[in-house]
Amino acid sequence: MGEKATPAVYKRYICSFADCSASYNKNWKLQAHLCKHTGERPFPCTVEGCGKGFVTLFHLTRHSMTHTGEKPCKCDAPDCDLSFTTMTNLRKHYQRAHLSPSLIYECYFADCGQTFKKHNQLKLHQYIHTNQQPFKCNHEGCDKSFSSPSRLKRHEKVHAGYPCQKDSSCSFVGKTWTEYMKHLAASHSEPTICDVCNRKFKNKTHLKDHKRTHEVERVVYKCPRDGCDRTYTKKFGLQSHILSFHEDSRPFACGHPGCGKTFAMKQSLDRHANTHDPEKKKMKKPRPKKSLASRLSGYNPKKLSKTPKSASELGKLPPDGPPDTATAMQNLSIK
């Protein structure tokens, strides 16, 4: 009678950190995992000015290809010339694009049914259903966790801030993206001067709009009222002109003490208000947080409650204007 086969014993490498139950079948996987606890990056990139570090040699090698542009894994499918840095990415591409181009991953939770092109996207989505937040912040003293790597990365900026990258000698670090953008505008903004007439502007958008006035051939909007030959480079300008000049409609009044100016368009009033208080911060209305139920169902009461606005609400021409006014707004005349 033959001896019974001894069952195979699989060795596991267990994380030694408290409150962590992670275990792996290979030692290098455990070593890479431990770096999440210690914050170490034992494989730094040696390219000058890069400064990135990685937890495994494989990740460093893959990253190095971003500097060299090397993509050794080529797709051999007919009429496909794409290349990839790793075989894993090539296999994923081949599966999605050539074997199962219509393959979708559907969420199996009740009353959900959302579909995704990638399995990883489905997996991250399902954390919403299970209320899991497996991506933990490693910053000392911070115990927050998140349902996706992107949310964790966004949170980590709270600790790291936004260092100025415009000038190597600039030591500014913004606490928020808005603060960082304000710094760029104040300290590193490029000159916005018209190279034709030397006029200065607050930003590139205003300069771009102004430059249209110097174009030999440009799209203009001509006032359709009899005896008026005014033209404008924007619909907004023509709308404002007709309302204020021909219709004498200026419903938006400035509330600043001693001012009393009136305007045909709310945008004009907002722009004028800055002359009284240039440092006034534009306060954004906080976006209401969606409940878990609304996120899972996709229900958006705001969208459903929207009703078409009237022409006057949209800042368009008055409904009692001449019949040819609306037509003139649509027809462009080249001056």
UniProtKB/Swiss-Prot annotation:
Chain intervals annotated as zinc finger (C2H2-type): 13-37, 43-67, 73-98, 105-129, 135-159, 162-188, 192-214, 221-246, 252-276
Location of the region described as Disordered in the Swiss-Prot/TrEMBL record: 269-335
Biased segments, Basic and acidic residues type: 269-280
Basic residues: bias regions: 281-292
Gene Ontology BP annotations: ribosomal large subunit biogenesis
Signal peptide residue numbers: none
GO cellular component, as recorded: nucleus
Keyword Repressor: no
Protein's cellular compartments: Nucleus
GO MF annotation terms: DNA binding; RNA binding; zinc ion binding
Keywords, ordered alphabetically: DNA-binding, Metal-binding, Nucleus, Repeat, Ribosome biogenesis, RNA-binding, Transcription, Transcription regulation, Zinc, Zinc-finger
InterPro entries with a match to the protein in the record: TFIIIA_Zfn-C2H2, Zinc_finger_trans_reg, Znf_C2H2_sf, Znf_C2H2_type
Protein origin, superkingdom: Eukaryota
Main location: nucleus
Amino-acid biosynthesis keyword on record: no
Stated role: Involved in ribosomal large subunit biogenesis. Interacts with the internal control region (ICR) of approximately 50 bases within the 5S RNA genes, is required for correct transcription of these genes by RNA polymerase III. Also binds the transcribed 5S RNA's.
Protein name: Transcription factor IIIA
Organism: Lithobates pipiens
Record lineage: Eukaryota, Metazoa, Chordata, Craniata, Vertebrata
